């Protein structure tokens, strides 16, 4: 080969080697970066590793030393510091091929991969080498899974067999016991089987030594001392009864063995008054009862507190004096507590009677004595009528009822028309009669007993009619109503008192002359029931008016008609016209009293229930409730349909439909509502009153809210 050919061949080889070295160097850099990323991930996962120092040795971790260069911050210093220069070894120039050879020959990456494989093998085991003989692997093989599942099924079957054996043991009757078991165990095994007479006799013939030899008695304090029997042991044998018979016995009667001390001290729990129990007859062949007794004081204390009355009373009696009550003989009953069944027979009163040594008890309740005057204020508004209300002196009148019937209940009224006060009702009460049956047995109590008497609330009304009437005395015992005429046909003078009274003006019928003395005074007494009387309304006066009657030929003789009450107490048979010597001028036209409507016939309690049913605002007084319902009835015609309304929604729908039609007739108010102008509810009420429609403000407010009408209070 020529020298030129050799040179060209050498150049080609050099180029080839250079490119080969460059590629190897690039691959080495890539492997090194990959190894560094793996090392970083391993260092992060090492914090979650559970190290076991006993079984495994820690994996060595290469330490990386970083040299931190310190910069001199104090540049502006007066003194210059000498720097210690570190002598560094001169670096040896190394070619790229040699550096590649060193990196490739050290095989650092291979060592790191081997350490990682060793860690994984130690933790999770070798999957390929897993077999039944090598149990070092933590992976469970298929055979192990199958054995575990079979063991679970077998254990369930064993549990089922065990349960069946237990149930069969308790359900099936036990076989006869063999030798070595006594009759007590046989009796407890089958309690329903009764023992024979010979077996019972053999049990009772047992010696006490046999009983004590079979039992072990030891002292609690010292277990090393020999057993000693200080007290005799009494054993009571009882045959267990059937469930139906055993259920009738008490809880303490089913004990088969009881240990009873020979002497039990008697403890008296009730020390005052002194009491010595009488000896009781001990039953023969019964369970021994203990002598411990409890003394119980029997007292039937009767409450003497009076019932709360519906009427507020202002009692003007003097302070009651303390009243001494005589002591009575108190009976003490002894109840003996025993573990056995309690004897139903109680000791007689005669055998155990003691006298109480306690001091007399002063009762805070004063027994009613004499006459007490109770003043009750009743609010009423009396309209102008031809009847004068005359105040009558109650001392000159006779009793309406007897003392027994009128205790705390008889009412007398004397009506007047004071200027700033309401009419006054005087309630009179008297002492109760003594009970004639003194020999009757009274309940044992140290408190005074007050005999309860049913209360009656009576109302007496005095009417003065400016006409001559012939009234027959009338008494209705069933309804407790009494009517009579007082005095002659002359006016009764009103007694002068310190209080100024305002006289009720007379009507047109009484205008006949100042010297006309043709008047009639009628007194009506009736019973007021609780449902007819409330504190919010006045039931003092009847609705009295003058009407013409077709049966009377003489129109100058008026007839009194009383209405507005369920039981009419006057009719045409009781009141007859009386001819007068002189004619009384009567006006041509007489205003007639309106007949009572269906709403007026209802009581205040019934109307209050209607208000609550319809959701109306509750008001005080029957007259106010009737007035509100009459205003609502104008929107619901006829009136009987108002009382037939079932609920609140039906009533509101009927009122609101008629109210819409009434408002649309008045164009002024209707235009304001259409323009969303705020209106006052009082203005709407005044507009309706101008058209003879009367509704309360709460009903109008509900109408505005349901219809979306804007309202204001300004």
Swiss-Prot record:
One of its GO terms (molecular function) is 5'-flap endonuclease activity. Phosphorylated in response to DNA damage. Residues 79-92 have a biased composition (Basic residues). Residues 1-14, 24-34 have a biased composition (Basic and acidic residues). Keywords: DNA damage, DNA recombination, DNA repair, Nucleus, Phosphoprotein. GO terms for biological process: DNA recombination; DNA repair; DNA replication. Residues 36-46 have a biased composition (Low complexity). It is found in: Nucleus. The keyword Repressor does not apply. InterPro entries: Slx4_ascomycetes (IPR027784), Structure-sp_endonuc_su_Slx4 (IPR018574). GO terms for cellular component: Slx1-Slx4 complex. It holds the Pfam family Slx4. Transmembrane segments: none annotated. Residues 1-116, 337-369 are annotated as: Disordered. Forms a heterodimer with SLX1. Belongs to the SLX4 family. Regulatory subunit of the SLX1-SLX4 structure-specific endonuclease that resolves DNA secondary structures generated during DNA repair and recombination. Has endonuclease activity towards branched DNA substrates, introducing single-strand cuts in duplex DNA close to junctions with ss-DNA. This is Structure-specific endonuclease subunit SLX4 1. It comes from Candida tropicalis (strain ATCC MYA-3404 / T1). The lineage of its organism: Eukaryota, Fungi, Dikarya, Ascomycota, Saccharomycotina.
